[in-house]
């Protein structure tokens, strides 16, 4: 039974197809867009960190230049013993005289700003700090160390404040009761279209054994078949009676083939003795097996000292950020 497709079914099919296409396009767009957005945010964060480090480095350089200018003018200034942005301030630099210019502060001043190593005469003694090893990097800092251990979890935060009460709803309205429609008795409608075939049901119970069948009747004789293949030959017949005696008719024939060789004759008499043989020197024989190894000899004297080895690899500044130079350099 053919089921005709209605207009509503065709419209629902179009809507379902459009919904599937739109959802598939949205999933593909999200799969492509999210990694690109994440990559952009990560690159922007890296660029922002580089710019922040550059600003910190410029600020540090400005402070160092200001300190050097104050030290060059001979102004007594009491500086705090501390680290500047996590960087070491060498005491032998031009700005190190801050701890030695003022005689009444920490130590006696020096012409090169190295007064931190001399004893003061008006107040406290000079601050004794170990000089760091000389570095070749312009950033004056080493590579980043390994990450530290994970810290303990923080305390739970305080509960938030209760939210504001919601607005009052609208007042209810008294609606009239819906008008009752008159009861209409409709006639029985036409049967609907035949539904799809349902799934196969479970197997039924086993039936009782049937009655024994009756013997069938013999069929009619069939048609004659094709002739069979040729049979095998029969056994040999009995031996016949002997024939008549033959007659000898002498006729000269051809010469026959030579006969077989006769047996070996008896050995002949012993011959005369031959002359004496001559001796020749044979080739040298193969070398003999190797003997057992001898005892280990005494240890020899120590050799002279070898030449000095090559110098080790020099440090590099691969961990330093690229310099930020103004346009035109």
UniProtKB/Swiss-Prot annotation:
Residues 156-173 have a biased composition (Basic and acidic residues). Residues 146-329 are annotated as: Disordered. It comes from the Eukaryota. GO terms for cellular component: collagen trimer. The keyword Repeat applies. Keywords: Collagen, Cuticle, Disulfide bond, Repeat. GO terms for molecular function: structural constituent of cuticle. InterPro entries: Col_cuticle_N, Collagen. Residues 200-212, 251-272, 320-329 have a biased composition (Pro residues). The keyword Metal-binding does not apply. Residues 187-199, 273-282 have a biased composition (Low complexity). Residues 142-171, 189-212, 216-248, 253-279, 282-320 are annotated as: Triple-helical region. Nematode cuticles are composed largely of collagen-like proteins. The cuticle functions both as an exoskeleton and as a barrier to protect the worm from its environment. Collagen polypeptide chains are complexed within the cuticle by disulfide bonds and other types of covalent cross-links. Belongs to the cuticular collagen family. This is Cuticle collagen 6.
């Amino acid at each position: 039974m053919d089921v005709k497709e209605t207009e509503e079914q065709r419209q629902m099919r179009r809507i379902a197809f459009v919904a599937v296409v739109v959802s598939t396009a949205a999933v593909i767009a999200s799969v492509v867009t999210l990694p690109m957005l994440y990559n952009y945010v990560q690159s922007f964060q890296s660029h922002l960190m580089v710019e922040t480090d550059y600003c910190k480095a410029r600020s540090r350089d400005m402070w160092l230049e200001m300190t050097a200018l104050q030290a060059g003018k001979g102004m007594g200034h009491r500086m705090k013993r501390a680290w500047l942005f996590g960087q070491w301030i060498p005491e032998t630099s031009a700005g190190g005289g801050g701890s030695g210019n003022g005689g009444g502060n920490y130590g006696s001043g020096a012409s090169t700003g190295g007064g931190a190593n001399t004893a003061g005469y008006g107040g406290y003694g000079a601050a004794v700090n170990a000089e760091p090893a000389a570095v070749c990097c312009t950033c004056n800092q080493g590579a980043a160390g390994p990450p530290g251990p994970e810290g303990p979890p923080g305390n739970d935060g305080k509960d938030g404040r209760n939210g504001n009460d919601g607005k009052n709803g609208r007042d209810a309205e008294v609606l009239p009761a819906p008008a009752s429609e008159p009861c209409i008795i409709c006639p029985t409608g036409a049967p609907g279209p035949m539904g799809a075939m349902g799934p196969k049901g479970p197997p039924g119970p086993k039936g009782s054994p049937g009655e024994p069948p009756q013997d069938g009747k013999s069929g009619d004789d069939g048609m004659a078949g094709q002739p069979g293949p040729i049979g095998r030959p029969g056994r040999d017949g009995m031996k016949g009676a002997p024939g008549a005696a033959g007659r000898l008719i002498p006729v000269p024939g051809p010469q026959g083939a030579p006969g077989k060789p006769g047996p070996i004759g008896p050995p002949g008499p012993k011959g005369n003795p031959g002359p004496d043989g001559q001796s020749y020197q044979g080739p040298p024989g193969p070398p003999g097996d190797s003997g057992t190894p001898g005892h280990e000899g005494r240890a020899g004297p120590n050799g002279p000292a070898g030449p000095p080895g090559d110098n080790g690899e020099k440090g590099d500044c691969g961990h330093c950020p690229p310099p930020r130079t103004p346009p035109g350099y």
